[in-house]
Protein backbone atom coordinates (compact mmCIF):
# COMPACT_ATOMS: atom_id res chain seq x y z
CA UNK A 1 0.00 0.00 0.00
CA UNK A 2 1.04 3.57 -0.70
CA UNK A 3 -0.02 5.61 2.31
CA UNK A 4 -0.34 9.39 2.75
CA UNK A 5 -0.16 10.66 6.34
CA UNK A 6 -0.78 14.24 7.40
CA UNK A 7 1.48 15.60 10.15
CA UNK A 8 -0.39 18.03 12.40
CA UNK A 9 -3.15 16.51 14.51
CA UNK A 10 -2.55 13.09 12.99
CA UNK A 11 1.01 12.39 14.12
CA UNK A 12 1.17 15.05 16.82
CA UNK A 13 -1.15 17.09 19.05
CA UNK A 14 -0.72 20.45 17.35
CA UNK A 15 -4.07 21.99 18.25
CA UNK A 16 -3.60 21.23 21.94
CA UNK A 17 -0.25 23.04 21.80
CA UNK A 18 -1.83 26.00 20.01
CA UNK A 19 -4.50 26.16 22.72
CA UNK A 20 -1.73 26.55 25.31
CA UNK A 21 0.00 29.11 23.09
CA UNK A 22 -3.20 31.19 22.81
CA UNK A 23 -3.30 31.45 26.59
CA UNK A 24 0.38 32.37 26.78
CA UNK A 25 0.30 34.99 24.00
CA UNK A 26 -3.18 36.51 24.24
CA UNK A 27 -4.78 35.22 27.43
CA UNK A 28 -7.43 33.48 25.32
CA UNK A 29 -8.71 30.23 26.80
CA UNK A 30 -10.35 27.91 24.31
CA UNK A 31 -10.55 24.30 25.50
CA UNK A 32 -9.39 21.74 22.94
CA UNK A 33 -12.93 20.33 22.49
CA UNK A 34 -14.15 23.85 21.65
CA UNK A 35 -11.73 24.28 18.73
CA UNK A 36 -14.52 23.98 16.19
CA UNK A 37 -12.78 25.53 13.19
CA UNK A 38 -9.69 24.36 11.34
CA UNK A 39 -8.99 28.07 10.77
CA UNK A 40 -7.34 28.92 14.08
CA UNK A 41 -7.97 32.65 13.69
CA UNK A 42 -11.70 31.81 13.92
CA UNK A 43 -11.36 29.30 16.75
CA UNK A 44 -9.29 31.70 18.87
CA UNK A 45 -10.91 34.92 17.60
CA UNK A 46 -7.65 36.50 16.44
CA UNK A 47 -7.27 39.51 14.17
CA UNK A 48 -4.89 39.35 11.21
CA UNK A 49 -1.90 40.74 13.09
CA UNK A 50 -2.44 38.43 16.05
CA UNK A 51 -2.90 35.44 13.76
CA UNK A 52 0.36 36.12 11.92
CA UNK A 53 2.27 36.34 15.21
CA UNK A 54 0.49 33.25 16.51
CA UNK A 55 1.38 31.14 13.47
CA UNK A 56 4.96 32.38 13.37
CA UNK A 57 5.43 31.44 17.03
CA UNK A 58 3.78 28.06 16.48
CA UNK A 59 6.24 27.26 13.70
CA UNK A 60 9.42 28.16 15.58
CA UNK A 61 11.73 25.12 15.79
CA UNK A 62 11.60 24.72 19.56
CA UNK A 63 7.80 24.90 19.51
CA UNK A 64 7.50 22.37 16.68
CA UNK A 65 9.84 20.00 18.49
CA UNK A 66 7.76 20.25 21.67
CA UNK A 67 4.56 18.87 20.12
CA UNK A 68 3.43 15.64 21.77
CA UNK A 69 3.00 12.52 19.67
CA UNK A 70 -0.55 11.35 19.05
CA UNK A 71 -0.71 8.03 20.95
CA UNK A 72 0.18 5.03 18.79
CA UNK A 73 1.26 6.98 15.71
CA UNK A 74 4.91 5.95 15.53
CA UNK A 75 4.17 2.32 16.42
CA UNK A 76 1.66 1.97 13.60
CA UNK A 77 3.81 3.83 11.06
CA UNK A 78 6.78 1.59 11.81
CA UNK A 79 4.64 -1.54 11.59
CA UNK A 80 3.53 -0.42 8.14
CA UNK A 81 7.09 0.20 7.03
CA UNK A 82 8.19 -3.19 8.36
CA UNK A 83 5.34 -4.80 6.41
CA UNK A 84 6.51 -3.19 3.18
CA UNK A 85 4.02 -0.35 2.96
CA UNK A 86 5.22 2.90 1.37
CA UNK A 87 4.53 5.78 3.79
CA UNK A 88 4.83 9.50 2.98
CA UNK A 89 4.16 12.29 5.48
CA UNK A 90 2.71 15.22 3.55
CA UNK A 91 2.33 18.38 5.60
CA UNK A 92 0.99 21.85 4.93
CA UNK A 93 3.83 23.33 6.97
CA UNK A 94 6.12 25.66 5.00
CA UNK A 95 9.54 24.41 3.97
CA UNK A 96 11.14 26.64 6.62
CA UNK A 97 9.69 24.13 9.10
CA UNK A 98 11.17 21.12 7.28
CA UNK A 99 14.28 20.59 9.44
CA UNK A 100 12.53 20.66 12.85
CA UNK A 101 9.70 18.58 11.38
CA UNK A 102 12.21 16.04 10.09
CA UNK A 103 13.94 16.03 13.50
CA UNK A 104 10.60 15.51 15.27
CA UNK A 105 9.93 12.45 13.10
CA UNK A 106 13.44 11.11 13.70
CA UNK A 107 13.20 11.73 17.45
CA UNK A 108 9.91 9.81 17.55
CA UNK A 109 11.30 6.77 15.78
CA UNK A 110 10.10 7.56 12.27
CA UNK A 111 13.46 7.98 10.55
CA UNK A 112 12.44 5.94 7.50
CA UNK A 113 9.38 8.01 6.58
CA UNK A 114 9.62 10.48 3.70
CA UNK A 115 8.53 14.04 4.47
CA UNK A 116 7.11 16.55 2.00
CA UNK A 117 5.95 20.14 2.57
CA UNK A 118 2.98 20.76 0.27
CA UNK A 119 1.39 24.18 -0.18
CA UNK A 120 -2.03 22.95 0.93
CA UNK A 121 -3.45 26.10 2.44
CA UNK A 122 -1.73 29.13 0.91
CA UNK A 123 -0.12 30.04 4.22
CA UNK A 124 2.58 32.31 2.79
CA UNK A 125 0.99 35.18 4.70
CA UNK A 126 2.48 34.23 8.06
CA UNK A 127 5.96 33.18 6.91
CA UNK A 128 6.90 35.50 4.10
CA UNK A 129 8.63 34.14 0.99
CA UNK A 130 8.16 30.60 2.26
CA UNK A 131 8.88 27.72 -0.08
CA UNK A 132 7.40 24.25 -0.26
CA UNK A 133 9.25 21.07 -1.17
CA UNK A 134 6.33 19.62 -3.14
CA UNK A 135 4.39 21.60 -5.72
CA UNK A 136 0.76 20.74 -6.37
CA UNK A 137 1.42 19.66 -9.96
CA UNK A 138 3.96 17.10 -8.71
CA UNK A 139 1.73 16.00 -5.84
CA UNK A 140 -1.08 15.26 -8.30
CA UNK A 141 1.23 12.81 -10.08
CA UNK A 142 1.60 10.79 -6.87
CA UNK A 143 -0.68 7.82 -6.22
CA UNK A 144 -1.94 6.63 -2.86
CA UNK A 145 -4.17 3.79 -1.70
CA UNK A 146 -4.92 5.20 1.73
CA UNK A 147 -4.69 8.58 3.47
CA UNK A 148 -4.75 9.66 7.11
CA UNK A 149 -5.97 13.26 7.37
CA UNK A 150 -7.83 15.45 9.87
CA UNK A 151 -8.47 18.61 7.87
CA UNK A 152 -11.65 19.02 5.80
CA UNK A 153 -9.72 21.70 3.88
CA UNK A 154 -7.41 18.97 2.56
CA UNK A 155 -10.12 16.69 1.21
CA UNK A 156 -10.03 18.48 -2.15
CA UNK A 157 -6.49 17.17 -2.66
CA UNK A 158 -7.85 13.64 -2.89
CA UNK A 159 -10.35 14.19 -5.70
CA UNK A 160 -7.91 12.88 -8.33
CA UNK A 161 -7.84 9.49 -6.58
CA UNK A 162 -11.38 8.07 -6.79
CA UNK A 163 -10.46 4.77 -5.11
CA UNK A 164 -8.53 6.33 -2.22
CA UNK A 165 -9.65 5.32 1.27
CA UNK A 166 -9.39 8.28 3.65
CA UNK A 167 -9.05 7.69 7.37
CA UNK A 168 -10.39 10.91 8.88
CA UNK A 169 -8.70 11.33 12.26
CA UNK A 170 -11.48 12.42 14.60
CA UNK A 171 -11.01 16.01 15.79
CA UNK A 172 -13.47 18.67 17.05
CA UNK A 173 -13.14 20.70 13.82
CA UNK A 174 -14.17 17.84 11.53
CA UNK A 175 -17.09 16.37 13.48
CA UNK A 176 -19.79 18.35 11.71
CA UNK A 177 -18.34 17.91 8.22
CA UNK A 178 -20.19 15.92 5.58
CA UNK A 179 -17.74 13.56 3.91
CA UNK A 180 -17.47 13.68 0.09
CA UNK A 181 -18.27 9.98 -0.35
CA UNK A 182 -18.24 6.56 1.29
CA UNK A 183 -14.47 6.22 1.00
CA UNK A 184 -14.07 8.53 4.00
CA UNK A 185 -14.02 6.71 7.34
CA UNK A 186 -13.93 8.45 10.72
CA UNK A 187 -11.25 6.98 13.00
CA UNK A 188 -11.01 7.76 16.69
CA UNK A 189 -7.40 6.62 17.14
CA UNK A 190 -4.40 4.93 15.55
CA UNK A 191 -5.55 1.50 16.70
CA UNK A 192 -8.66 1.82 14.56
CA UNK A 193 -6.53 2.89 11.59
CA UNK A 194 -4.13 -0.01 12.19
CA UNK A 195 -7.05 -2.47 12.24
CA UNK A 196 -8.47 -1.15 8.97
CA UNK A 197 -5.14 -1.41 7.15
CA UNK A 198 -4.49 -4.90 8.53
CA UNK A 199 -7.88 -6.07 7.28
CA UNK A 200 -7.61 -4.47 3.83
CA UNK A 201 -3.96 -4.99 2.93
CA UNK A 202 -3.38 -7.22 -0.07
What residues fall within each predicted segment?
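Short, basic/glycine-rich phosphate-binding loops at helix/coil junctions
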Residues: 43-60, 114
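C-terminal cap/substrate-recognition subdomain and adjoining C-terminal extension
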Residues: 94-202
